[in-house]
Amino acid sequence: MKVGVVGDRETAIGFRLAGLTDVYEVKNDEEAVKAINELANNENIAFIIITERIAESIKDKLKNINKVIVEIPDKHGKLERIDPVKELIRKAIGVSMK
């Protein structure tokens, strides 16, 4: 089984240097969706690594993907996002989890 990667230029270069071959450098959401669909339809791909920023911008399209998707920070660092489980707990019982 292989790993697929979808990311910006720097992310793609890093994974290519690490020896991965199924690496897509994308510049916009349309290219990202096309690359992820190609990887998702490849039976040799076990999971797909994408940058958090790409995942955030196309999150609706990722719901239909049947592969494991791993989000990683890009060169700008980790995105500050609300943990959905913590938010559900806060709404349900009124207590913020840290």
From Swiss-Prot:
GO terms for biological process: proton motive force-driven plasma membrane ATP synthesis. Gene3D superfamilies: ATPase, V1 complex, subunit F. Pfam families: ATP-synt_F. It comes from the Archaea. It is a peripheral membrane protein. GO terms for molecular function: ATP binding; proton-transporting ATP synthase activity, rotational mechanism; proton-transporting ATPase activity, rotational mechanism. Optimum pH is 6.0 for ATP hydrolysis. GO terms for cellular component: membrane; plasma membrane. Keywords: ATP synthesis, Cell membrane, Hydrogen ion transport, Ion transport, Membrane, Transport. InterPro entries: ATPase_V1-cplx_f_g_su, ATPase_V1-cplx_fsu_bac/arc, ATPase_V1_fsu_sf. SUPFAM superfamilies: AtpF-like (SSF159468). Optimum temperature is 80 degrees Celsius. It is found in: Cell membrane. Purified ATP synthase is 25.9 nm long. The hydrophilic A1 domain is 9.4 X 11.5 nm, the central stalk is 8.0 X 3.9 nm and the membrane-bound A0 domain is 6.4 X 10.6 nm; the domains are connected by two stalks. ATP is synthesized or hydrolyzed by the A1 domain while ion translocation occurs via the A0 domain. HAMAP family: ATP_synth_F_arch. Belongs to the V-ATPase F subunit family. The A-type ATPase is composed of subunits A(3), B(3), C, D, E(1 or 2), F, H(2), I and K(x). Component of the A-type ATP synthase that produces ATP from ADP in the presence of a proton gradient across the membrane. This is A-type ATP synthase subunit F.
